[in-house]
């Protein structure tokens, strides 16, 4: 799980949190 803003996502890559998942770049 992750929280909006990407705090729990991979900080070394451009991942963002979307609907509880970390995805690359923007939410579709």
UniProtKB/Swiss-Prot annotation:
Signal peptide: none annotated. GO terms for molecular function: calcium channel regulator activity; sodium channel regulator activity; toxin activity. GO terms for cellular component: extracellular region. The modification 4-carboxyglutamate is found at residue 7. Keywords: Calcium channel impairing toxin, Disulfide bond, Gamma-carboxyglutamic acid, Hydroxylation, Ion channel impairing toxin, Knottin, Neurotoxin, Secreted, Toxin, Voltage-gated calcium channel impairing toxin, Voltage-gated sodium channel impairing toxin. The modification 4-hydroxyproline is found at residues 4, 14. It is found in: Secreted. Disulfide bonds join 2-18, 9-22, 17-27. Expressed by the venom duct. It comes from the Eukaryota. Its main location: secreted. The presence of a 'disulfide through disulfide knot' structurally defines this protein as a knottin. May inhibit sodium (Nav) or calcium channels (Cav). This is Conotoxin de7b. It comes from Conasprella delessertii. The lineage of its organism: Eukaryota, Metazoa, Spiralia, Lophotrochozoa, Mollusca.
